[in-house]
Amino acid sequence: MAIERTFSIIKPDATRRNLTGAINAVIEKAGLRIVAQKRIQMTKAQAEAFYAVHSARPFFNDLVSFMTSGPVVVQVLEGEDAVAKYREVMGATNPANAAEGTIRKLFAESIEANSAHGSDSVENAGVEIAQFFSQNEIVG
């Protein structure tokens, strides 16, 4: 097992309901360390760039609108197999299919307003982290 870093976003549906601390508690209980974190208002340009892989999908504009509808908390998480571990901790994209105790089962409102984003690979984690953090902001 390797120590990895992954990228997380606590989405607007969760920040609106003041769930950052509760979500952080789930993350830390799973053995992941939060080595960088900041609350930001994502711009339309940032959201479009971040979700560019989905630009041809019918839900793209709704996704950009949602992600810019309120503050988000961007994070760098670190730990053993952090990418896979955080995806397990988040739960299935559709909260109806998420396992008990996962972030999405506990806090999500819908498949879109599902409270959290996590990188899907180590490579994408590196790209996503670099979009929001400089190296000197990551203090592990």
Curated annotation (Swiss-Prot):
Q: What does this protein do?
A: Major role in the synthesis of nucleoside triphosphates other than ATP. The ATP gamma phosphate is transferred to the NDP beta phosphate via a ping-pong mechanism, using a phosphorylated active-site intermediate.
Principal subcellular localisation of the protein: cytoplasm
Q: What do we know about how this protein assembles, alone or with others?
A: Homotetramer.
| UniProt xrefs under InterPro entries | NDK-like_dom, NDK-like_dom_sf, Nucleoside_diP_kinase, Nucleoside_diP_kinase_AS
Q: Which UniProt keywords apply?
A: ATP-binding, Cytoplasm, Kinase, Magnesium, Metal-binding, Nucleotide metabolism, Nucleotide-binding, Phosphoprotein, Transferase
Supply the name of the protein: Nucleoside diphosphate kinase
| Organism from which the protein derives | Azorhizobium caulinodans (strain ATCC 43989 / DSM 5975 / JCM 20966 / LMG 6465 / NBRC 14845 / NCIMB 13405 / ORS 571)
E.C. number: 2.7.4.6
The UniProt entry's GO CC annotations, sorted and at most eight, read:
cytoplasm
